[in-house]
Amino acid sequence: MSDPQEKSHIILKVWCFILGLALLITGAFYVIGGGKLISLGGSWYFLIAGLMITTSAFFMFKKKATGVWLYALAFIGTVIWALIDAGFEFWPLHSRLMFPAGLFAAVMLTLPSIRKYQYQTPMSAPAYVIGGLTVLGMLGGLYGMFIPHETVKASGEELPLVPVDPAKKQVNWDHYGNDAGGSRFVALDQINRNNVSKLKEAWRFRTGDFTTGTGNGAEDQMTPLQVGNKVFLCTPHNNIFAIDADSGKQLWKAEVNSTADAWERCRGVAYFDSTQPLVQPTLAGATPVAALAANTECPRRVYTNTVDGRLIAVNADTGARCKDFGVNGTVNLHEGLGENTKAPRFEVTSAPTIAGTTIVVGSRIADNVAADMPGGVIRAYDVITGKLRWAFDPRNPDPNYVLKPGEIYKRSSTNSWAAMSYDPQMNTVFLPMGSSSVDVWGGNRTAADHKYNTSVLALDATTGKEKWVYNTVHNDLWDFDLPMQPSLVDFPMKDGTTKPAVVIGTKSGQFYVLDRVTGKPLTKVIEQPIKVADIPGEQYSKTQPRSVEMPQIGNQTLKESDMWGATPFDQLMCRINFKSMRYDGLYTAPGTDVSLSFPGSLGGMNWGSIAFDPTHRYMFVNDMRLGLWIQLIKQTPEDIKIQANGGEKVNTGMGAVPMKGTPYKVNKNRFMSALGIPCQKPPFGTMTAIDMKTRQVAWQVPLGTIQDTGPMGIKMGLKAPIGMPTIGGPMATQGGLVFFAATQDYYLRAFNSSNGKELWKARLPVGSQGTPMSYMSPKTGKQYVVVSAGGARQSPDHGDYVIAYALEK
């Protein structure tokens, strides 16, 4: 044998050993995992393919072409199975075929050398053609990773740009959701879909208050306000800034420096101008807005409620405390709550709500800590004096009962932690309600809990009297508390008229459209029968509401074929995990076994809320698609001794956390693969446009890439728009645009509101969890888009940025 031939044989032996080893490992993993999957009632594919691949490995070690043919047969079967299992969806096919295709290309390109080694006809041409075509197909698959794959394609019809009515042109963004009804719609069109590509950074401001990025600590989730030439900001520790609307230069700073052991965030501030005339309601029978006391010290005010339980008013002109508000500018929100109220058990994270001359405040009560927790009482204060005007105590037989000295509000009652809305024509405040303590066990719940938990509540803003309440989950055991600001819209009815409505999205991926006056649904809602679990004494509801006439977003009933992974290996493990859990669809009740909740307690939709374009009756909403596995475990005497404070990372794999005062501790975690990737198929987060005239999805696109994240938190650097979990909210404009920033990658994006096409994006220094806002400067007439960037959720990169963009001159 000549030296070159001997050398080639050595190379072939080494290569066949490496290739055979790869086949053996793959086949063995398939056989072991596939056997387990079959035992759980799952697919036979992995076991059958594994046996074929393992056998092909032994022939490959022997450098025999039989190994190639066996693997080729396995690959053909894989392609057929993948098409049957996943259809023609890109990401599911990518997961099933990319790795096997790589092995197939390798064995086919090895075939001529093996046949030559066995002194057979090499078959070079067909082997190289098939191998080359497979490589080309893989390159096509790689190219497809960088193309957005819409889950719902737009019709192609371009919505016309409607000129701004001068009477409706936006002057200020002076509420958390732009207006009191939370539209997040900007009636400005200087920046529009035709020129947004020319948007450039105009200024950059730094607060000096950094986030931690853990998800459980300090997070920047702010939406700024703008009034006149001032932009008002707050930081995770509730420090307030006023900056110049054109230059971004600091005008004043109000030091607050609130602290908590966990969950430090300020989603926004509130603004009130006492020099403006009061707007009285026009609805017949509505209670008048209360008159104000004389006010000269602070004619214009900015309010923040803090994570350590204070409501603070500062002068909007100077930043100085308004001494006539409460005690030297501060109201103590711990008053009347009883013991154990220290944050993070009791906190206020969402912006306070200005409702006429009343400022309304809810609270965040820590989840799954104890049956005895601070009450979720809703309180309203005079905007000038800070005196308590009314309280709504959901567990009290008289919710508006006025406490006597030494009394406290009912413990563990239903709270409202998200932003509220206000209708000045009705003088009514609309509240998204949470759950009574604890969230995943309801054995101690009262009739009042069942009434108010996970409901939309309408209260008279002057008196606090209940107008109506609408329940969206019965005996909520899933932590499906209503997470977002109710949106007040004029809803198009099928007869061509419109009705004042409240629209709210839920963690369960549903939308409820309610008559604003009566609270009755304006779209069809059914009661869906559900299965119960095995918890003794649990007050199971046998049915749950389903809003069937509105789109369902990311809450489909999962099947084994919906399981996904970056490779077939983690996909197989996700299949095993899925089949190992009890799962009955959307309302799978927690039990003593391991069950799956999809979507989980993050949603679905969360606090980012909805943007509504009244010119076209389009609604825009982002979502995340994360499952949650959960198990209730009987507590031991040792568990009872543990004192939880509400700062535990119960969703990040720290183990079972005792729920004091209940029979159980709870163990739960996100339904993810070993690589830290959600187990169900992408997208994991989308932007959806809903045409409210037809009540259908107009378009839906994935949000975010894996450029700044990836498996096990490793930054992949790939601009592959797979669609990642989102937080924060959208902003729509009359310029035909939807802006969004709260993705896992570090971008502010602008989409065409007609079809979801990305028209522009700007790289941010770190990620954002904030909602963009926009205004037109009264000095320069220039429109700005502003967003905060303190770091994406659980990102290693933290910041303190507020950045404005405007068109180039």
UniProtKB/Swiss-Prot annotation:
CC cofactor: pyrroloquinoline quinone
- What switches on its expression? By protocatechuate.
Q: Where in the cell is it found?
A: Cell membrane
Catalysed reactions listed for this entry: L-quinate + a quinone = 3-dehydroquinate + a quinol; shikimate + a quinone = 3-dehydroshikimate + a quinol
Membrane topology value: Multi-pass membrane protein
Record's keyword terms, sorted: Cell membrane, Membrane, Oxidoreductase, PQQ, Quinate metabolism, Transmembrane, Transmembrane helix
Q: What is its main location?
A: membrane
Q: Which GO terms describe its biological process?
A: 3,4-dihydroxybenzoate biosynthetic process; quinate metabolic process
User: Quick one: which pathway?
Assistant: Aromatic compound metabolism; 3,4-dihydroxybenzoate biosynthesis; 3-dehydroquinate from D-quinate (PQQ route): step 1/1
What is a GO molecular function of this protein? quinate dehydrogenase (quinone) activity
GO CC aspect terms: outer membrane-bounded periplasmic space; plasma membrane
Question: Which domain of life does the protein's organism represent?
Answer: Bacteria
Q: Which residues cross the membrane?
A: 14-34, 41-61, 68-88, 90-110, 127-147
**Summary of the function given for this chain in its UniProt record:** Can act either on quinate or on shikimate.
The protein's name is Quinate/shikimate dehydrogenase (quinone)
- The record lists the organism as Acinetobacter baylyi (strain ATCC 33305 / BD413 / ADP1)
